[in-house]
């Protein structure tokens, strides 16, 4: 479908803005707020429905890569890129931004005391994790300058995302937010090459929205598009552990206007061992296993590829899904159906731990009396799997792994059956590929020339390639989001400027995040009270509590947008526990601490109103 303007015919614009930002994650939120701060009226549109906006930022560790010495940090990054060529001006812009992150938090995010990840490891559960990220490549020269900055001393709690989202909502007079409204096409003038607007699917209709000064592409990667995964990365499949809404839409739009693509093969992962999660057909999103799980790499257990042979060193801690290979860190080969293979003794060892980091571990595990039978059940080669077990046993007895160099003291020979196999998947955090940009955040064409009025930021065409240090993507969102927003807002004089307007024949709706809604949509009866919390990963949680004679009679969750997996589990299970125990202060659901905390906060808010009736209100 050709979306270029017919110069002999007037296009019917449904609305006009100064700047349109596509994608409401860290990069899009940043671009929108800085465009607004530079005087622009902004439309921020996202494909995800309310509560699922935020892209991968919602699910990230909330750490932002930071460096204190420009020269050392640049040298460190040169080693990360290795033989991969990177534009010097782009790298200088990025590294300079990294050295300003603490000040950025103070000046622009209103964080009075940003936390240095290196200095504060208060939570022992995260200390090893912290040491593995800052720096992620301690052997590289200049690594001593690497740090991570956080909003507070907490991780994986959407704290940065909620801060960025708040910067958007507080500018609701300047920024309109459209959710569940995917951009479909960029509208480019065929004579001038100027990107003049965006075609958006809004309320089941395609509408053309004009951008007087610029369009920012901040719509993430292609993690959820398996065709793109196979075509660009060249692997059969990857299991997403971030957002489910990054589907590669930006690639089509960018190619449609002649943009150059770069870093298409680069992607980051995270998980146990080198970067695994579990393959469970009941889950659209893979479980992010952050907690240490030594039993999966210690004992009579190994990882088998599709044919039953070993291919990764099980006791190696991956670096964002990268494993050490002949002098550098690479994404390991991705197979269609890898499995953990283990024996009865290992099964008992895992079983003895009680509650596991993954609740469905035994539910998805396959059992067989012999290795040959197990191979057939998992569609591996029986002869190959038998040989793999035999070699593993020899290595275990000799204390030396001659295949993959796993530490001998982590290996125990397989004993008698039964034997077990648990399906695995290579975990995918994010892709890096997309439209190539320059240091001004301008999207470039096939000849490295800027496409007029088109900008980008974030993981859609990210700067990071080859080896990656944690927090680098979020830093890029903040750095290039600011540049893109400011440059897109600059008044241009190469097209006819249209005043802000809306077609009277098209119902576009209003700002989907308008603060005028809140609790006014819900009613209460006798002994009922509304409670609200904005602490959820998906944003606001609203509950209606029935409270009588100091007894918590009922808890109804009226509004929430937590993640489909463990977040929803918290919303379903905790209200029953609260009523049973007559308190909001119940144990959190494993893996859903933020969602649990938000629900408890909302119920506490309602109970406070119940016990202080004079102050009870619905606002």
PLM regions and their residue ranges:
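Conserved redox-cofactor binding core of oxidoreductases
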Residues: 96-206, 226-227, 274, 396-416
């Amino acid at each position: 479908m050709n979306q270029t303007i017919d110069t002999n015919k007037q296009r019917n614009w449904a609305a006009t803005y100064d700047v349109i930002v596509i994608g409401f994650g860290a990069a899009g939120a940043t671009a929108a707020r800085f465009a607004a701060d530079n005087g622009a009226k902004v439309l921020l549109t996202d494909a995800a429905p309310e509560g699922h906006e935020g892209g991968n930022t919602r699910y990230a560790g909330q750490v932002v890569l930071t460096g204190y010495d420009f020269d050392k940090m640049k040298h460190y990054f040169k080693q990360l890129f290795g033989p991969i060529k990177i534009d010097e001006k782009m790298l200088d812009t990025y590294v300079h931004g990294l050295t300003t992150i603490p000040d950025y938090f103070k000046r622009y995010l209103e964080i009075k005391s940003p936390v240095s990840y290196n200095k504060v490891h208060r939570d022992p559960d995260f200390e090893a994790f912290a040491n593995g990220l800052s720096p992620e490549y301690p052997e590289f020269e200049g690594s001593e300058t690497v740090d991570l900055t956080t909003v507070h001393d907490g991780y994986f709690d959407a704290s940065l995302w909620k801060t960025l989202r708040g910067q958007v909502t507080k500018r609701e007079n300047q920024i309109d937010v459209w959710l569940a409204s995917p951009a479909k096409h960029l509208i480019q003038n065929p004579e001038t090459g100027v990107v003049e607007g965006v075609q958006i699917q809004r309320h089941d209709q395609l509408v053309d929205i004009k951008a007087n000064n610029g369009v920012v592409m901040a719509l993430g990667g292609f993690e959820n598009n398996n065709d793109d995964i196979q075509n660009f990365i060249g692997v059969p499949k990857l299991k997403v552990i971030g957002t489910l809404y990054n589907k590669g839409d930006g690639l089509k739009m960018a190619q449609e206007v002649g943009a150059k693509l770069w870093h298409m093969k680069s992607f980051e992962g995270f998980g146990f061992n080198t970067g695994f999660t579990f393959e469970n057909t009941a889950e659209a999103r893979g479980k992010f296993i952050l907690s240490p799980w030594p039993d999966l790499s210690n004992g009579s257990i190994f990882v088998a590829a599709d044919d039953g042979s070993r291919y990764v060193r099980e006791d190696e801690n991956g670096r964002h899904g990268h494993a050490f290979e002949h002098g550098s860190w690479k994404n390991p080969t991705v197979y269609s159906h890898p499995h953990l293979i283990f024996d009865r003794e290992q099964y008992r060892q895992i079983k003895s731990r009680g509650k596991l980091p993954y609740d469905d571990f035994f539910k998805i595990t396959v059992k067989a009396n012999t290795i040959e039978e197990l191979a057939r059940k998992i569609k591996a080669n029986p002869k190959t799997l038998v040989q793999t077990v035999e070699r593993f046993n020899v290595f275990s007895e000799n204390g030396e792994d001659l295949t993959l160099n796993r530490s001998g003291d982590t290996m125990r020979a397989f004993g008698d059956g039964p034997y077990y196999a648990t399906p695995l998947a290579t975990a995918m955090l994010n892709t890096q590929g997309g439209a190539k940009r320059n240091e001004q955040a301008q999207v470039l064409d096939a000849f490295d020339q800027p496409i007029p009025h088109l900008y980008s930021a974030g993981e859609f065409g990210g700067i990071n390639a080859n080896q990656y240090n944690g927090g680098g993507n979020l830093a890029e969102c903040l750095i290039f989001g600011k540049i893109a927003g400011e440059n897109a807002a600059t008044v241009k004089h190469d097209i006819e400027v249209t005043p802000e307007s809306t077609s009277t024949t098209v119902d576009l709706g209003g700002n989907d995040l308008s603060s005028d809604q809140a609790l006014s949509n819900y009613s209460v009866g006798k002994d009922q009270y509304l409670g609200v919390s904005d602490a959820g990963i998906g944003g606001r949680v609203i509950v209606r509590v029935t409270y009588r004679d100091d007894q918590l009679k009922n808890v109804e969750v009226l509004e929430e947008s937590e993640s489909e997996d463990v977040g929803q589990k918290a919303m379903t299970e905790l209200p029953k526990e609260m009523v049973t125990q007559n308190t909001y202060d119940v144990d959190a659901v494993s893996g859903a601490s933020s969602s649990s905390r938000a629900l408890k906060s909302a119920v506490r808010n309602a109970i406070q109103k119940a016990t202080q009736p004079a102050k009870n209100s619905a606002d």
